[in-house]
From Swiss-Prot:
The gene is ureH. Its main location: cytoplasm. GO terms for molecular function: nickel cation binding. It is found in: Cytoplasm. It holds the Pfam family UreD. This is Urease accessory protein UreH.
């Protein structure tokens, strides 16, 4: 059962407009989704904010998102606010997302953190298809719960999967399962006393492993590391006791990359 009359759907397709910047070619959405028109905070980089006009995801909510980033587009997709997963009772909420990034296109997918409330159960599956010349920044930040209420790891279960393919060949797979019933999530191999977790993947981005490591080490209150994945792409994983240090670290990395790849129009 879905809270809405139908499965919540979002479709977005972009292309290069007459002025050489990324524009929306086609879009479609059902409640609670909405899209803001693109704006251009820096040069030829477009930014589109994804809106969800709802208090958060409930039991039975199912989201189906398909994003097609056209060739040569440079796009940053952000969200409106922190995403809340409410008590799903004996059910769960889910999201299926498919992203295609075209030739010579750049996508920075930068949503706000996800907060699972007490007894929340969430399933997320993301598949990203790239070309050899595509560039990608993709991240998720997961919070231990409503930290201000000291509601830590009281959710039911959280399971997210991320698959990235380049020219139809898999280059990255992440399978995150957080289940407080079966695992002590505060142990030193998991959150180790921290409350916020960042997973950031960088594909074909102009950044060296040593540079990413230096930014992590300079970030106050952040415990993290960076490693190389297939074809020298990078994956950053970090922990903190608040969202701001992780958002700030992510923004520093993204800003450095966009300053390199964007150009004046």
């Amino acid at each position: 059962m879905n809270t809405y009359a139908q499965e919540s759907k979002l479709r977005l397709k972009t292309k290069i407009g007459a002025d050489g910047r990324c524009v929306i070619e086609d879009n479609f959405f059902t409640p609670p989704f909405k899209l803001m028109a693109p704006f251009y905070p820096k040069d030829d980089l477009a930014e589109i904010m994804l809106l969800a006009v709802s208090p958060g995801m409930m039991r039975g909510d199912a989201q189906d998102m398909q994003l097609n980033i056209g060739p040569n587009c440079k796009l940053r997709i952000t969200s409106q606010s922190f995403e809340k997963i409410h008590n799903t009772e004996d059910g769960f909420a889910s999201r299926e997302m498919h992203i295609v990034v075209g030739e010579n296109a750049f996508l920075d997918f930068a949503p706000f953190p996800l907060i699972p409330f007490e007894n929340a159960h969430f399933k997320g599956n993301t598949t990203i298809s790239l070309r050899s010349s595509s560039q990608l920044l993709y991240s998720e930040i997961i919070v231990a719960g409503r930290v201000a209420r000291n509601e830590l790891f009281q959710f039911n279960r959280l399971h997210t999967k991320i698959s990235i393919l380049q020219d139809e060949k898999p280059i990255y797979y992440d399978n995150t399962i957080l289940d407080p019933k079966t695992t002590d999530l505060n142990n030193m191999c998991m959150f180790d006393g921290y409350t916020h977790y960042l997973n950031l993947v960088l594909v074909n981005c102009p950044i060296e492993l040593s540079g990413a490591r230096e930014w992590i080490e300079e970030s106050e209150g952040v415990d993290g590391a960076v490693s190389e994945i297939a074809s020298s792409h990078l994956c950053v994983k970090a922990l903190a006791k608040g969202s701001e240090p992780l958002l700030h670290l992510r923004e520093k990395i993204a800003r450095s990359i966009t300053q390199t790849i964007t150009q004046k129009i």
